[in-house]
Structure formats: C-alpha cells, structure tokens
Swiss-Prot record:
Source species of the chain: Mus musculus
Designated gene of the protein: Fcor
Effect of disrupting the coding gene: Mice are glucose intolerant and insulin resistant, despite being leaner than wild-type mice.
Effect annotated for changing S92A: Does not inhibit subcellular localization. Does not affect phosphorylation in response to forskolin
GO molecular function: acetyltransferase activity; chromatin binding
The name this protein goes by in its record: Foxo1-corepressor
Length: 106
C-alpha cells in the first residue's frame, strides 16, 4: 500500500527500537523485564510479567506510538527480548531483541 514497512526478520540481525527520544527513565510505575526465547525465565516468576509471557512468541508492540514491531525468533533460538513495561498502563515503552553475539541496549 503505502510503501515498505519496517519488518524485522525472525532470523537475522537484531535491531533495537527506540532511542534517547523514546527511552523512559526509571521511576515509579516502571520496571524492566527480560526473558529469553529459550525456555522459562526469571520474568515468568514475576506476576506482573504475565502479559509479557503471553507475548513471548508474538509480535510485541512498543508503547511509544511508533507502531513498529519487533519479531521474536523461533523457539529454541538464543535471544533475549528486553521490555520496559509501564505497570500503570501495561504498555511497553521500549523493546530490544538481542541475538547471540549481538549487543544492544534499550
């Protein structure tokens, strides 16, 4: 329709969403979560991370209004998705996929 969309491949290089302009500073109502795509993780033990667990193999919508998505890798692959979730609105403000050998930050 309108042109090529920014779609992250399920296999390939990782790319982080957001930057200094969209990064939220830690504060009341904000908490950093992380989980790996390979099996259970620490986030699974956090009650507030239930939504993230449900989204673990689905596109994740960042709450910065950009409408961009980051796609998780296939089950069994090595990668980590970092999400800063606003506990008040239950929306993520940053997400970043890290693959083996790739470094990145939200």
């Amino acid at each position: 329709m309108g042109g090529p969309t920014r779609r992250h491949q399920e296999e390939g290089s990782a790319e982080c969403l957001g930057g200094p302009s969209t990064r939220a500073a830690p504060g009341p109502g904000l908490r950093d979560f992380h989980f790996t795509t390979a099996g259970p993780s620490k986030a699974d033990r956090l009650g507030d991370a239930a939504q993230i667990h449900r989204e673990r193999m689905r596109p994740v919508q960042c709450g910065d209004g950009s409408g961009e998505r980051v796609f998780l890798q296939s089950p069994g692959s090595i990668g980590t998705l970092y999400i800063r979730l606003d506990l008040n609105s239950q929306r993520s403000t940053c997400c970043c996929l890290l693959n083996a050998g790739t470094k990145g930050m939200c």
